[in-house]
Design a protein with these regions (language model features):
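Catalytic cores of carbohydrate-active enzymes across secretory and cytosolic contexts
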Residues: 1-191
């Protein structure tokens, strides 16, 4: 399997290079310390990019990254977040809910097919409640140690935004998605 991901690499200080890993793993969507880490780097930009860490890393200026790589307080928080992330990734299945309550299922992957997964507003590939529910299932499965893979479609036009004009009429504004600016990874099979 070949994974293609346009990670932010130009000028990323080595000391904080794991920000790329955090950005492309949607674990940050339910890890408040991870989200706060990005926000701390540039609060205004974090809001401008609507809390999308991939787009954030593409747009943040080099000077802020360099400053963060030398800021001991930031680095302490960064190290705690990266350690928690690594613990989650390397968690022994026997210590999870699935390992304790259904050990016969450890190592068996679940494929979860859904038309959409509402994981976070930064990845607006959902249109309503069922997509949000599917996203919640993915998050809970992760917390329980269930090896679940969400399979879906990536719509180029995500969740519609609405605006009201000066006459009071509602208008839909499509959200055109750039897959390279979203926390997504293109995967190719060997064949």
């Amino acid at each position: 399997m070949v994974v293609s991901r346009p990670a932010y690499t130009v000028g990323m200080p080595e000391r904080i290079s794991r920000l790329n890993d955090l950005a492309y793993n949607v674990w940050w969507t339910w890890s408040n310390p991870a989200r706060l880490l990005f926000k701390e780097l540039h609060p205004v930009l974090w809001d401008v990019v609507e809390h999308n860490p991939v787009l954030f890393l593409h747009r943040i200026d080099q000077e802020r990254l360099e400053r963060a790589a030398g800021d001991q307080q930031f680095l302490q928080r960064y190290d705690r977040v990266v350690s928690a992330f690594d613990r989650m990734l390397g968690q022994d299945a026997s210590s999870t809910w699935i390992g304790k309550h259904r050990p016969e299922l450890v190592g068996k992957t679940v494929a979860y097919f859904s038309a959409e997964f509402g994981l976070h507003r930064a990845l607006p590939i959902y249109s309503g409640g069922l997509g949000v529910l599917a996203g919640d299932h993915v998050k809970e499965a992760s917390d329980m140690g269930i090896p679940l893979v969400g399979v879906s479609l990536l719509y180029r036009q995500g969740y519609l935004r609405q605006r009201i004009d000066h006459f009071g009429w509602q208008h839909d504004v499509p959200a055109n998605l750039d897959p390279h600016a979203e926390p997504t990874t293109q995967v190719f099979n060997d064949d």
